[in-house]
Amino acid sequence: GTVVGFTHLLNDSTYGGITVTPGDLSTTTDGNGMFRFDEAPVGSATVQAQHDGYTTGLRYVEVYEAQTTTTQMALMATQTWTFTADDGGTVALSEWTSSGYATTLSIDFPPSAVVHEDGSAYSGTVYVTVAMIDDPSELEAAPGDMSAVDTEDPAATVPLESFGMFTADLTTSEGEPLELSTAVDIWFPAYGSHEPGDSIGLYTFDEDTGLWVNEGTGTIDGDGNFVASVSHFTWWNCDQPVTNTSCLQGVATGDDGTPITGGHVRAVGIDYMGGGYGDIAPDGTFCVDVKPESENTIKLVAQSDNTIWTGETTGTGGLA
C-alpha cells in the first residue's frame, strides 16, 4: 500500500528534513513537509516523525493493498533541564505574559526519586526533556488522534477534550533511560474555565495502541492549576470525555472544483483543545465529529489521481 502525509515543526518555518518512519521504512520530508511510501506493508502501522530538539510525532494508520492512506502531524520544540538525582529538583517551564513570566509546568522530583531502568540506585545528573501543550494551536503535536479507552466500556473508544498535556523523558548524559522509583507531583495551569476542587481525569498515552488510558484524576487548586501525581513518564493529559459530538460537514474540491477523493480531514479546535478525523468520500464529502458549537480549523491531506492535495479552512460544529 501507499502512505502519504504532511508534517512540520510548530512555530518554525522548517518543513524539510524531518525523518519519517512507518515500521522499517524511512524517508525525510521534502521542502513542503510532504512524505510518501509506495511499498508500505499492508496492515496497522505506526508512523513516527522525528527531528532533533523536538517531540516525536505519532500517528496510527491502516494500510491497504493498492490504496493510499494519508496522515498529518506536527512536532513541538522540547526543553531540557538537569538536576542531581541524590538531591532532587524542580523542573519549571515558563513563558512570558503581559504580567511577566508565568509557570506553564512544574514537576517536583524528591531526592533519590530517579533510578536506573532495572531499579538500581542512580546518583548522577538527570536530564529531563519536556514539552507542554497548553493551547489549541499546539494540539497537532499531540500523539494519536485524541481517542481514549472508554472507562465505561473498555472495548470502545471516546474522544477527549484536553485542558493541558505534557511529555517528559528522563535520561543520563549518555542517553540511557531512567525511571521513577516513587510518584512525583506535577502541576500546570488548566486551559479553560474551572472551579477550585474540580476533579478532572488524568490520562496517559499508550504507544502500542495509540490510545489514551485513564490512570486516575487530578484536582484544580485555588489558582486554577491542575495538580496530580504521576508514577512514570510518557505523555500525560488532563481531560474529559466528549460525550456529545456534532458532525462538521464539508466538501473537498480541487482548484477546478472537481471533488477530491482518497484522503482525510482533521478538525483541530480553535476555542477548545480537541477535534477529530474524517475520511473523504468518493464524492468529496466528509463528516468530522467535533464538540458541538465549537470553532475548528479543518486540515486536509489527500491524493487524487497523481496529485497530492493539502488545504486548510475553518468551520463551526452544529448543535449536539
PLM region spans:
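Proteolytic cleavage junctions
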Residues: 1-3, 31, 52, 59, ...
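Periplasm-facing N-terminal accessory domains of Gram-negative outer-membrane beta-barrel systems
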Residues: 3-40, 46-50, 60, 70-71
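Predominantly extracellular/luminal cell-surface or secreted proteins
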Residues: 8, 23, 131, 203-205, ...
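Short flexible loop/turn segments that cap and initiate beta-strands
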Residues: 13-23, 119-126, 181-183, 198-199, ...
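Residue-level detection of beta-strand scaffold positions
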Residues: 19-23, 33-35, 45, 214, ...
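A short, solvent-exposed loop/turn motif at the edges and junctions
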Residues: 22, 42-66, 74-76, 291-319
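Short, mixed charged/polar active-site loops
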Residues: 26, 56, 102-106, 273-275, ...
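Predominantly extracellular/luminal regions of secreted and cell-surface proteins
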Residues: 104-152
